[in-house]
Amino acid sequence: MSDSPVKKGRGRPAKAKPEETASPKAAKKEEKKVEEVPKKIEESTKPENGAAPKKGRGRPSKGDKAAPKRPASGKGRGRPAKNAKKVDDADTEEVNSSD
């Protein structure tokens, strides 16, 4: 068998000691000096064709309403609003004007 300790369980392995992890070759290497290269900064982030920035990215803000759902073909706009149900007003005007 090898010199390595016997692994008894499937748990997380013990943390290695710094003496074991450091190799003698790593100590001999000299640190290389890194030259800082200036990155090219783009002048503008706008698209070239002049299009508006895309919407619908990420989570919507808290006050935003949900987008209106597209009705199936031939179904109209669904249930009318509550304030649009007053239809009796037209009938009462005809009766009042005949007097």
Curated annotation (Swiss-Prot):
GO cellular component, one term: transcription regulator complex
SMART domains: AT_hook (SM00384)
Segments of this protein annotated with the region Disordered: 1-99
Biased composition (Basic and acidic residues): 16-46
Biased composition (Acidic residues): 90-99
Any GO MF annotation of the entry: minor groove of adenine-thymine-rich DNA binding
UniProt KW keywords: Chromosome, DNA-binding, Nucleus, Phosphoprotein, Repeat, Transcription, Transcription regulation
Domain of life: Eukaryota
DNA-binding residues (ranges): 7-19, 54-66, 74-86
Subcellular location: Nucleus, Nucleolus; Chromosome
Post-translational modification: Phosphorylated in a cell-cycle dependent manner; substantially reduced in cells that have finished proliferating and are differentiated. Phosphorylation at Ser-4 and Ser-23 results in a 10-fold weakening of DNA-binding activity and altered the mode of protein-DNA interaction.
Coiled coil: none
Family to which this protein belongs: Belongs to the HMGA family.
Function: Binds preferentially to the minor groove of A+T rich regions in double-stranded DNA via the second and third DBA-binding domains. It is suggested that these proteins could function in nucleosome phasing and in the 3'-end processing of mRNA transcripts. They are also involved in the transcription regulation of genes containing, or in close proximity to A+T-rich regions.
Protein name: High mobility group protein I
Source organism (scientific name): Chironomus tentans (Midge)
